[in-house]
């Protein structure tokens, strides 16, 4: 992976700030020292930052919960001893459950959320007013704050399947996930990029477990899971010895610039050799009216969480690649990246964002 992200680096153990408390459909993540309390008077000045996170247990819900912890620094928290190292002053991050990415975007549009985490293809569709956003129209004020990871197209078939490649799935029954789910929406986009548009397959709405059982009975020919790598669900399927992965690559030259090819390394999953796959960035997005000081603070907080040792690897992890942006960057986020890049040890294959 050429451009890692703040989130992927923090997942690797570079210091999350705080924990998550799930209540009433909201994961409340507060970054302050154990035993500390927020002054009731100071609490009146807190700025809530609600992040559309998808359904509980989804990859994006976990990402949103971690980001909420990293950026939180509400009034009465411990004093910050370094710029950005303790979150955004006065901010309280909340990971808010939503039905799916479309719900996240529409809630952001309707100002009941301050941000959302979606894949770049969903952000692009929202900006353009296409696909699931055709009725609502373009969200022209959608802005990117930072890339927060990537999800990879996993195509699973039964071990005894005769399919040797993705082209063999044309006209076949492919389980793409629950209808209108994060997985189903992005799976369609990635399969289309691989040369299998929806009109060339028989898309089946099904949960992964049900689809996996259907593969063994022959009711389904393939299942698609768009997930982080490694995926727990894919790992369990491969460990059973009853399934295998098919590779995929971008077909044609007119695919969106934010899609790219990724390799699933040999051994990443039990019994799986190196396999080519298609990936798409996951993006923290907000409206253009997000106050500049908050956009700036978010970038700095995520930067510092990713770079405790100021290593070259960590430096590369936080910087987004211009070529993979699907929506314009918030100007203050872009400016913060530009400034921080000047202090980084090295940033191979990456640039500060521009619009």
Annotate each language-model stretch with its function.
Residues 206, 210, 227-236, 245, ...:
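An extracytoplasmic/periplasmic, membrane-proximal ligand-sensing/linker region
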Residues 2-7, 13-94, 103, 140, ...:
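N-terminal hydrophobic or amphipathic helices and topogenic motifs
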Residues 81-135, 155, 209-215, 220, ...:
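Pocket-flanking alpha-helical
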Residues 134-148, 153, 268-276:
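A structural signal for short loop-to-beta-strand junctions that line the ligand-binding cleft
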Residues 171-189, 258-328:
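Ligand-binding clefts/hinges and TM-proximal coupling segments of bilobed small-molecule sensing domains
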Residues 120-122, 129-131, 161, 197-285, ...:
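Pocket-lining segment of extracytoplasmic ligand-binding domains
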Residues 48-84, 147-217, 312-315, 319, ...:
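Bilobed "Venus flytrap"/periplasmic-binding protein-like clamshell domains
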